[in-house]
Structures are given as C-alpha cells and as structure tokens.
C-alpha cells in the first residue's frame, strides 16, 4: 500500500484540509491547504517536482509582540539608552538594537556603521525628552503610538530627529486638522524649524486662505517685520480688497509703535497701494496717526493718489487670489429663447461645471466680479410668453453655489455693458423696449445702492465696456439708427465722458476686454456681416491697430481674460448660434479653438472668479 502523503496524528498540521477546488486551471496536481493560522500551497515546478509554500500572516506582529515582552522584562536586551533632556531627570530604557535599527535610520547608522555606539551597551542620548523617547521606543516594537494633543509637537520633533517618517506623517496630519487662525502661524514656524516641508506648506496655505482672521490673532502681532513683508507680498492672499492688507500692516505697527514705526515704509511698498481706491487713500492720509508722523510714507501715498486720480499707467501687479482654480463663468444667453444656465469652464483641464441656474432666464446680460462674487446685470427674458427687459442685479457666491438678488437698476437694460472701478459696478447703456439708453449708473455693493452718473455722449446698446487705469471705456454699439465705431471714456473724478479715437471698423455686439494695458475689441456686427476681425487700442498712442482675426465670425459673444489670454465664447455668426470657444495668445498673435460650450448660444454674461465649492455643488445636485 502506498503511504498517504498527508500528515496525520494530533499535530498542528493535521488541521489542514486539501482544497483542490481552489487550484487554478492548468495547475495539475497542485493542492492548497488552509487553516485559520496559516496558508500553505503545493504547486508543480518546471522539473515535475512539487513545491511546498507556507506563510504565517501574523508572524511579524507576533514576533514583535514577543520582543516587546522581552524588552519589558529586560531579557535579551543589548543596549540601554540613557536619555537626558535639559533639567528633566535622566531616564534609562533597555531595548534591542535590531528593533531600534529597523524603526529608525538614525539608530541603524548608530549601531551598524562602525560608530562608537555600535559596541556600547549604554548609549547617552541628549536633546530629546525621556517621555518622547519612551513613546518612540514603544512605537518601534508595537507600530502604535498614543499621546496627549499637547505633546504632539514634542513627539513630532523627536520623530524628525530620528527620521521615523511614519510618526512624522501621523503628527503632521493631526496638526493639519487642528489648523486654526489662532495657531496657524505657530504651526508654520514650528514646521519650518524642524524641516517638515509638507506641514509648513499646508500651514502657510491656511494662513493665505484665512488671512483676514489670522491678522486678528496674537501670533500675527508677534511676526517679525521681515516675516510680515514676506506674507503680504504673496499673490495668493485671500482678501476681498487690498485695504485688508493695509489695515493689517497698520495694526501690526500700532501693536508696538515705538519699535515698529521704522518699518512702515517697507510695509507700504509690499502693500499693493495702486489697488487701493483714491477715496480710501485720501481718508488714510487725513486720519491715520501712523502716516501723520511719517512724512516719507505720507508723500509716498500722496504720489500714488495722484497717479490714480490722474489715471496714469502703472506697473500692473498681479491680482491677489487664493491658490484655488479660477474658472470662466458663463451666465444666461439665448438659443431660441433666453436661458437660465450658469456654467463654469476650467481651462486647465477642459471641463465644464453646471451650477445653480439664474432665478430668471436672461440674455443680453453682462457679467462682472467684485470681491470674488459674480454679478449678473440686466438683460432680457425672451420667452414664448413674451419679452421682458430686466433691471435686475443678481449676485452669485461660488462658496455656496447660490444666487441672491440685489437692488435693481433704475431702468431695465438689455444688451448692456458693465465695468468695475474701485469695487463699484458701472452699468452702461442698453435698451428698454424701443428706448436706447445713454444713461449710466453706479452700484455700491457695501450699501446695495445704485446712483446715476453722467450719461454717455452717445446712446449705445450692444456696447462693449472695459476698465483701464481706472477709466471706463464704452466701445461701439448701436444708437437706434446706426452701428457705431466710435468710443468714449468716463473720468470718475470729473464725472464726465470724453470721445476717444474711433475704431477702424463699425462694431455692435463686439466683445471688449483689457489685456496688458491695451483694449481689445473682437467681432461684432457692422450692419451687413458678423465680423471675425479684432483690433487693439493703445492708450499711450491713442491708436487702434488690427491683430490676428478669430477663426469664426461672431457677434453678441462673451469675452474675458484668463491667465494672460483672451477667451471668446459663443455668439452668432449670421446663421448659427455658436458653441465654440477660442483663445488668443498675445505673444504669438494667434487664435486657437480650445473647447465647445455645452450648447450654442449668444448674449452670455461672462466673468472669471474662483472655483466653486464642490461640496455645495454635490449636496445640491444630490437627489437622495
């Protein structure tokens, strides 16, 4: 009789059962044995002999558990760490070199690279608290660590010293979760001191995003002037207006005026003072005690005030914006009837987001951004039930994905143009039925109020509007009789309009924007054809020159600037409502078609602001 190859008897292996049904197809006589304690497998080899494999899955855990028991009972230990930290009592910890070396590259180098500690039974350790070392030794044996939240910084510092990366990451993740306006600067400084790059970056990003709240905390007032200058020089500070940065600096100086008044000039040069409004500067020059006592700083701000009010070209500083995506928003539009869509295009990945609809469908509206909020102004609701011109002003908050109504304009305005100066929205021209407006009104968001300002010299609907050097430009349009190539400029200090050089081409419904201190007018309708030509106005030479034409003819298009390039969206080519989006690169003077809208449309309101909160979008799209 052939002997049974399987073991028998009362031993542990008698608990194995052959599981032939689990053998993979083509495995021949392979047999899998399984138990609750281990996994074993027999497989054929290339030479016809079978191979037996066995794995005890929790062996490592069990082995380290036994080694930890040996450590606690001080058996088979081959090193004693004698830990001394400042005035704390010294402590001794017995351990196994191999376990310490497996957990920490520092211990590994200490015990294997021929250093003097390699042959020592007692090793002196300084610079780390005994309680911290105790927790790190426990982690080496148990892969588990526990501490009070007040001890996290100390443990993380020790883990960095001994290069125990897993503990460093765990502590870093915990501290990121604890970031708060009151502790973010302290955590950032700590991370920089110990060289934890990721935690330092996350803490700095938190400071930039919550700048307003951080500047009210004690840690902010303990910054050095160099640290403060570095902070306020960031492009990605999340502030609604530059006055927040100005006030933060003045308050920092007032905290210790005697010692800090010497730094005011350096701070003001880091503040983007040309982004402050003349009214704000005038008030500070009159009332700020810090400026009153420093003639150099006062003269510096007086010069900026004069440059702003005289509308002199200045060096263009990047707009401050948090490091979140900035998207191109399109509101409303027309395709067979007015639309209520709000969508956002991300040029970085080519995706579109569908967001909260306008409360009332509108086309011929205009879009703009103030303080990160998107405003939809005027337009008309063309519907099967009739056409209604709109005086509405609605505000969209990307953080809540919600619209809220604001005070309406004094009159409805369809095919309107808008621009923003000093945080105020200017609504220009447009029509109400057969009335073509030359009137202009200004909206103050802080007061939720509209006020009429000086009317344009010419009635204009389908007017393109842009702002450059705090001057409001109205370009082209239709006066009720003729399409226009004329353009005019509004001076807010004088409350008056002046004509400027006319365009080379008649354009109604053109897209108008500002890029690199020039005004661009793209497309439009000349009374006979939709246009693809584009021209640029140089305010220094007061001349219009043609640049490369768009690939498609289009009027009633949307236009905006994103990261130094012009984007035109949709419009009407005389036959079709376009869904194409083109991008202009001023460096190469070329247009390229970059994407398509989700559907063709004309008369959209377009503007650029921060990416919406995905959490709010997901919650509002949830149908559960």
UniProtKB/Swiss-Prot annotation:
InterPro entries per UniProt: BACK, BTB-kelch_protein, BTB/POZ_dom, KEAP1_BACK, KEAP1_BTB_POZ_dom, Kelch-typ_b-propeller, Kelch_1, SKP1/BTB/POZ_sf
Gene behind the chain: KEAP1
Domain of life according to the entry: Eukaryota
Annotated BTB domain residues: 77-149
Modified positions (S-nitrosocysteine) in chain numbering: 151
Protein name: Kelch-like ECH-associated protein 1
Protein species of origin: Pongo abelii
Cross-link annotation N5-[4-(S-L-cysteinyl)-5-methyl-1H-imidazol-2-yl]-L-ornithine (Cys-Arg) (interchain with R-135 in KEAP1), location: 151
Gene3D superfamilies registered for this protein in UniProt: 1.25.40.420, Kelch-type beta propeller (2.120.10.80), Potassium Channel Kv1.1, Chain A (3.30.710.10)
Free-text note regarding domains: The Kelch repeats mediate interaction with NFE2L2/NRF2, BPTF and PGAM5. KEAP1 contains reactive cysteine residues that act as sensors for endogenously produced and exogenously encountered small molecules, which react with sulfhydryl groups and modify the cysteine sensors, leading to impair ability of the BCR(KEAP1) complex to ubiquitinate target proteins.
Subcellular localization, as worded in the UniProt entry: Cytoplasm; Nucleus
């Amino acid at each position: 009789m052939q002997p049974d190859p399987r073991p028998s008897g009362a031993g542990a292996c008698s608990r194995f059962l052959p599981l032939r049904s689990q053998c993979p197809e083509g495995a021949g006589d392979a047999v899998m044995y399984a138990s609750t304690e281990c996994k074993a497998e027999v497989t054929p080899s290339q030479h016809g002999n079978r191979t037996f494999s066995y794995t005890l899955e929790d062996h490592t855990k069990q082995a380290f558990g036994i080694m930890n028991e040996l450590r606690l009972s001080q058996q088979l230990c081959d090193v004693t760490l004698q830990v001394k930290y400042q005035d704390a009592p010294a402590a001794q910890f017995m351990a196994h070199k191999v376990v310490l070396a497996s957990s920490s590259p520092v211990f590994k180098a200490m015990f294997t690279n021929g250093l003097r500690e390699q042959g020592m039974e007692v090793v002196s350790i300084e610079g780390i608290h005994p309680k911290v070392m105790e927790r790190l030794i426990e982690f080496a044996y148990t892969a588990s660590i526990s501490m009070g939240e007040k001890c996290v910084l100390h443990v993380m510092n020790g883990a960095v010293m001994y290069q125990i990366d897993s503990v460093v990451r765990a502590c870093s993740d915990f501290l990121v979760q604890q970031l708060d306006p009151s502790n973010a600067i302290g955590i950032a400084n700590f991370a920089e001191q110990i060289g934890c790059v990721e935690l330092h970056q996350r803490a700095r990003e938190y400071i930039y995003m919550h700048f307003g709240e951080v500047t009210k905390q004690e840690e902010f007032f303990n910054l050095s002037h160099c640290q403060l200058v570095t902070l306020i020089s960031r492009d990605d500070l999340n502030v609604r207006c530059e006055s927040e940065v100005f006030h933060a600096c003045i308050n920092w100086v007032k905290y210790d005026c005697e010692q800090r008044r010497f730094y005011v000039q350096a701070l003001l040069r880091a503040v983007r003072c040309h982004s402050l409004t003349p009214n704000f500067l005038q008030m500070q020059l009159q009332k700020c005690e810090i400026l009153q006592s420093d003639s150099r700083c006062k003269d510096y701000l007086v010069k900026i005030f004069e440059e702003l009010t005289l509308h002199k070209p200045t060096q263009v500083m990047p707009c401050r914006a948090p490091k979140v995506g900035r998207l191109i928003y399109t509101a409303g539009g027309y395709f067979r009837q007015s639309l209520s869509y709000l969508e956002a295009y991300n040029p970085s990945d080519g995706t579109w987001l569908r967001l909260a609809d306008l409360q009332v469908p509108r086309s011929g509206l205009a879009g703009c951004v103030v303080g990160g909020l998107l405003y939809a102004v005027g337009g008309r609701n063309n519907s099967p039930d009739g056409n209604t011109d709109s005086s509405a002003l609605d505000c969209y908050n990307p953080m809540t994905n919600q619209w809220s109504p604001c005070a309406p304009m004094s009159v409805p305005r369809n095919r309107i143009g808008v621009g923003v100066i000093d945080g105020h929205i200017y609504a220009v021209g447009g029509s109400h039925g057969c009335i073509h407006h030359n009137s202009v009104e200004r909206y103050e968001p802080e007061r939720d109020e509209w006020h009429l300002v000086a009317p344009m010299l010419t009635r204009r609907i389908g007017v393109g509007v842009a702002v450059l050097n705090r001057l409001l430009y109205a370009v082209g349009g239709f006066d009720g009789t003729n399409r226009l190539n004329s353009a005019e400029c509004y001076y807010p200090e004088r409350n008056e309009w002046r004509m400027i050089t006319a365009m080379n081409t008649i354009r109604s419904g053109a897209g108008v924007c500002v890029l690199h201190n020039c005004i661009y007018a793209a497309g439009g309708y000349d009374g006979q054809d939709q246009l693809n030509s584009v021209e640029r106005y140089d305010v220094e030479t007061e001349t219009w020159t043609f640049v490369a034409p768009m690939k498609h003819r289009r009027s009633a298009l949307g236009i905006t600037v994103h990261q130094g390039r012009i984007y035109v969206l949709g419009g009407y080519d005389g036959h079709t409502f376009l869904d194409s989006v083109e991008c202009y690169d001023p460096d190469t003077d070329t247009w390229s078609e970059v994407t398509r809208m989700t559907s063709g449309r004309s008369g959209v309101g377009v503007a650029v602001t921060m990416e919406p909160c995905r959490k709010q979008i997901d919650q509002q799209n949830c149908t559960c």
